[in-house]
């Protein structure tokens, strides 16, 4: 999520070729900010019986197919990381459940915070740096030392408030593009912190919007998917530019990307 008061940084403004990363020299994020007690104020709860039953069912199905558990035990990644750009197929790929917590996950979260701050963001999901796991980091203030840094693994939305509002969002994976998206102004969340502790809390306002934007990334949903027709038509040409640039740098992946298709027909007085 691009911070609304800032523009895309130099590194965000250029496309990162598939499989490559951007090297940055940014001071490391304070590990103290990533301790599990960062979210203690929001309370803790045990994983619900339903969630455990669903996980057990998924693993049972995979054993029946002879493929073993669908969830790997650890995350393999190499730094430095960089934001991948639309339409990189990893932005649409399935994101796996995290089962291993502790130092490796903390180090990944630290690296993601570095990338996020370096690109003027206030939220970042793991698939945006090419890691298809259910992990996000965010700080609505978008500045180290201000606000609260949050690291959420395996987040789920328990409930949404009835009220909704519109906001012109920007995304680090879509340089040079903003668009209006409607979202609930309040969401109740369950997740795990970097130590694997179960947490539950409610987010409101802009913080709720940042979370929902990043949660969409974990679902393989991109923010232009939620734009109304007229708004989508306004950003269509930019989406096509990003697609063409990606294919120019990665011709072998052209058949793996999902293009936006033709521009929606313009309506006259509400009638085509």
Regions found by a protein language model. Name each.
Residues 22-272:
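Positively charged
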Residues 1-26:
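N-terminal chloroplast transit peptides
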């Amino acid at each position: 999520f691009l911070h609304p008061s800032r523009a895309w940084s130099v590194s965000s403004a250029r496309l990162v070729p598939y499989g490559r990363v951007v090297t940055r020299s940014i001071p490391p994020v304070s590990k103290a900010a990533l301790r599990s007690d960062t979210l203690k104020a929001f309370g803790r709860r045990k994983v619900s019986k339903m969630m455990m039953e669903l996980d057990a069912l998924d693993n049972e199905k995979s054993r029946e197919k002879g493929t073993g558990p669908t969830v790997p035990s650890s995350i393999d990644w190499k730094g430095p990381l960089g934001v991948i750009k639309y339409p990189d197929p990893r932005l649409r790929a399935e994101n796996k459940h995290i089962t291993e917590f502790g130092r490796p996950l903390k180090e990944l979260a630290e690296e993601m915070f570095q990338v996020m701050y370096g690109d003027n963001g206030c939220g970042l999901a793991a698939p945006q740096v090419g890691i298809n796991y259910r992990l996000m980091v965010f700080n609505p203030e978008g500045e180290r030392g201000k606000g609260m840094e949050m690291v959420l693994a395996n987040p789920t939305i328990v409930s949404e408030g009835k009220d909704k509002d519109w906001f012109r969002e920007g995304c680090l994976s879509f340089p040079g593009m903003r668009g209006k998206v409607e979202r609930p102004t309040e969401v109740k969340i369950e997740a795990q912190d970097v130590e694997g502790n179960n947490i539950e809390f409610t987010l409101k306002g802009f913080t709720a919007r940042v979370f929902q934007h990043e949660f969409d990334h974990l679902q393989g949903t991109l923010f232009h998917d939620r734009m109304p027709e007229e708004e989508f038509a306004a950003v269509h040409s930019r989406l096509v530019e990003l697609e063409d640039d990606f294919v120019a740098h990665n011709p072998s992946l052209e058949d793996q990307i999902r293009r936006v298709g033709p521009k929606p027909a313009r309506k006259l007085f509400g009638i085509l």
